[in-house]
Amino acid sequence: MSVSIVLQPGQVTLAQWRALYRGAEVALDDACAAAVLRSAQTVEAIVARGEPVYGVNTGFGKLASVRIEREDLQALQRNIVLSHAAGVGEPTPVPVVRLMMALKLTSLAQGASGVQPDTLALLDAMLRAGITPVVPCQGSVGASGDLAPLSHLAAAMIGVGEAFVGAQRLPAADALAHAQLQPRVLGAKEGLALLNGTQFSTACALAGLFEIETVLQAALVTGALSVEAAKGSDTPFDARIHALRGQPGQIATAAALRALMADSAIRESHRLGDVRVQDPYCLRCQPQVMGAALDVMRQAARTLEIEANGVSDNPLVFSDTGEALSGGNFHAEPVAFAADMLAMAVCEIGSISERRTAMLVDPALSGLPAFLTPRPGLNSGFMIPQVTAAALVSENKQRAYPASVDSIPTSANQEDHVSMAAHGARRLLAMAENAAHVIGIELLAAVQGCDFHAPLRSSTALEAARALLRAQVPTLQDDRYFHPDMLAASALVRSGALAQTVAIPLPGVEQDV
């Protein structure tokens, strides 16, 4: 199998995590082997000295005061994996689990967790062979790490549970055998190292970030199309306005809207003599709303990139001094905050998009035929797609309630404050999907609105977007079964095709226009 990304522990870029999520093949940088071996040898030395170290020769959680005999250390590590593999719910999507595996791999490879080189090699081999453990999506409170989801990963490594090989769902032992791999017998600390950490929450949050970024870029295109359909003004996007405020996301999104609308004949047709003084906020304030969403997404991205390159195990092994120190890096509060920010961003992206669709279907606001149909009354046109958009936006509003402000004590009050990062991060994919449908509906409505202005044409960029949609969805003349049209439009949003077809650099979490 060819490798397109080499993971360098502690130095993996956001672009590399995105590529991995999108299906790129990966392998671990061999340069980490020495640090991993030193870390494992440090744990062996601690065991030989007989000094008590949490999770190495003690029980777990509230049972940390129980000493474990040396001959039982392998059983201890197997037991923690089996007992903690207690997740429920639907399997986590394979791309997210692959992200989780890679995050765990690069964390362990930094040589602070005490795992054996062969354990790391097995995880690397599973990732490269396309063996993806079945990981139930529910059961983590985000401290002490993502115990249940990561335990299902660890269980597959010891031949327990299930795993996907391609589309096949197999017993984990059979999945390993499929690639001529042997289950591991875990040594001191290895089970705890595999299941302690924030990798599940971080993987879900990164997946959400990447999907929401795609949604935001598509929404800039549909927002510009809506301005054209309503014969709105591009004056609110003037660079001088946004420079005076200085918000970077606002400046970037305004620049994108200007570029998207450049050379539009529709815009020029009403530049002079338009009696309207100002457009509705949903058109005029796009840079302020979308820019704020972009800034929040960039802040979340920075947090997640740091987390993805960090070590969130406990205890941590310091080979230079021969110590294993107990701390709290497993507490996923940074991830929870980032997930909450992303939830707010995608909620607002969808919210202002729905308002534009509502504006377009209202002839009093848009100047277009009612519900964008040539014969309103006989036909209902876009009446109910706008209702669907409203329903999805309201669903996202409910989901946007911050998860990080919730906490519930666990493990007999030993683990008495938790982050709820997994809950906050898991919702993001569903929220992004809802928003993609909302923006897909706006795409249909805005292009339909532009069709009423024929023979006038929009800008080069927006005409490319119109052509992309019209290749799959014809202009609505009379009512037809709407569902396939909506699915086709949302697919253009989610795939990134809509943002790519305009051939203009659109702002994302890593770059400006």
Curated annotation (Swiss-Prot):
Reactions mediated catalytically: L-histidine = trans-urocanate + NH4(+)
Annotated SUPFAM superfamilies: L-aspartase-like
Record keywords, A-Z: Cytoplasm, Histidine metabolism, Lyase
Associated pathway: Amino-acid degradation; L-histidine degradation into L-glutamate; N-formimidoyl-L-glutamate from L-histidine: step 1/3
Post-translational modification: Contains an active site 4-methylidene-imidazol-5-one (MIO), which is formed autocatalytically by cyclization and dehydration of residues Ala-Ser-Gly.
Entry-annotated residues carrying 2,3-didehydroalanine (Ser): S144
EC numbers, comma separated: 4.3.1.3
Pfam families named among the record's database cross-references: Lyase_aromatic
Assigned GO CC terms: cytoplasm
Top-level EC class: lyase
Localization, UniProt: Cytoplasm
Family the UniProt entry places it in: Belongs to the PAL/histidase family.
Protein name: Histidine ammonia-lyase
Organism: Xanthomonas axonopodis pv. citri (strain 306)
Source organism phylogeny: Bacteria, Pseudomonadati, Pseudomonadota, Gammaproteobacteria, Lysobacterales
Gene responsible for this protein: hutH
